[in-house]
Regions:
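HhH-family (HhH-GPD) DNA N-glycosylase catalytic core used in base-excision repair
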Residues: 1-270
Length: 270
């Protein structure tokens, strides 16, 4: 049965900036301008009508509670933007340009595998691969006469081999995903401990031990799944922009940019 929740007079919520900024891969724009996505065991459509955000979906629980957690609706983004805007004009202008973006609270397992797949990849291809994995091994959920598929748990991927992943288009990432599944099933990667770890440095060290996880992927996982807002993922574009704006166009190494972000933005760097 379809549920609905309406967020009235919504501030700091612009679907296009949330779903098309590269933090998530299971959301797609619909013909009416809304977005439909699947996360965990929920399929939800998000539509903006004037100042209201309408959430409609086939959910595993109460849609309001699910949306509050996933979209971090209890966080005061107006206050956060106000604090960040005072740091410098570059950041102030960026906040105005990207107004309405929110950091989602995504599933750790799906986020981990998704960003391992993201290595040397582009967003359309990442989305295609994740959709193939989900359709092949996930559970089907129907919503508005269309079939959606959950991202498979480690247990669902237990018997999936390297060749199976390769046939889904993972390329060189197939062995990394295969090994990560195995390590998780053997509890060498403890997802529960990762979720409970409070120290960002300890968490980063543990994530870097996972096959296919480098510094950027580790920071993406911390920021987009574990609410570590001080995490600052550095890709080639972030590196270029920070180098140009703050270092007189002298290209800096990722570690230097990480240090700069920590000093400049503190625990809101992400």
């Amino acid at each position: 049965m379809e549920q609905q929740y309406i967020l009235e007079n919504a501030k700091s919520f612009k679907p296009v900036h949330i779903f098309e900024c590269g933090q998530c891969f299971r959301w797609n724009k619909q013909e009416d301008g809304s977005y439909t996505g699947i996360f965990k065991n929920n399929v939800i459509n998000v539509k903006q009508e004037n100042q209201n955000i309408i959430f409609s979906g086939n959910c595993s629980g109460n849609i309001k509670e699910i949306c509050i957690e996933y979209f971090d609706l209890n966080a005061n983004y107006e206050e956060i933007k106000g604090r960040l805007s005072k740091i410098d004009n570059y950041l102030k202008n960026s906040i105005e340009y990207g107004n309405g973006i929110r950091i989602l609270k995504q599933d750790l397992w799906e986020t981990l595998i998704s960003f391992i797949i993201s290595a040397n990849n582009n967003i359309p291809r990442i989305k295609t691969i994740i959709e193939r994995i989900s359709k092949a091994y996930g559970d089907k959920i129907e919503f508005r006469r269309k079939d959606y598929y959950t991202f498979p748990t480690p247990e669902k991927l237990k018997k999936v081999g390297i060749d199976d992943f390769r046939n889904l288009g993972l390329g060189f990432r197939d062995i990394r995903v295969y090994e990560t599944v195995g390590k998780t099933l053997r509890n060498e990667i403890d997802l529960n401990k990762l979720e409970k770890e409070e120290s960002v440095e300890t968490l980063r060290e543990k994530l870097l031990e996972i096959p296919g996880v480098g510094p950027k992927v580790a920071d993406c996982v911390m920021l987009f799944a574990l609410k570590k807002y001080e995490a600052f993922p550095v890709d080639v574009w972030v590196r270029r922009v920070i180098s140009e704006l703050y270092f007189d166009n002298q290209e800096q190494k990722p570690k230097k940019i990480q240090e700069f972000a920590k000093k400049q933005y503190g625990n809101l760097a992400g």
